[in-house]
């Protein structure tokens, strides 16, 4: 019906799963930030409409939550690390998965390099949990990118999160 009405849509199988994201920053080595998932308040199936995903609707807002399940977090991060050699180097990106808690199934969705850096989305939210302000995140990305491409010679200061990703399970950011 939506296609017939002229709308651009992507149709996906409904899994009752969570969208899970591993944000990665560039550096001397890839910097994996906290594994994050989106959840909708009051929706056990975690279904998000297009309007909700884009912040275009009134009502409950989705939350960005650091994953609590250490076994699943480790598994998803291992999948991410396995893909890095194919794409490295890059400035920043996110690796997206679907995680079904009832079965433990993890499905790869996509890699999005140079993705949205809006202050209320995954890369910025995970950076915030690691102790970076949005300004510091943008500064890190710009300096690393220009240095990597030979535009400037940046003084490299190792990125040292104030909180390690495995320590933030369950912390939440309203988006």
Regions inferred by a protein language model and the residue ranges of each:
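Phosphate-binding site of ATP-dependent enzymes
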Residues: 1-78, 102-107
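ATP-dependent carboxylate activation and anion-phosphoryl transfer catalytic cores
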Residues: 69-175
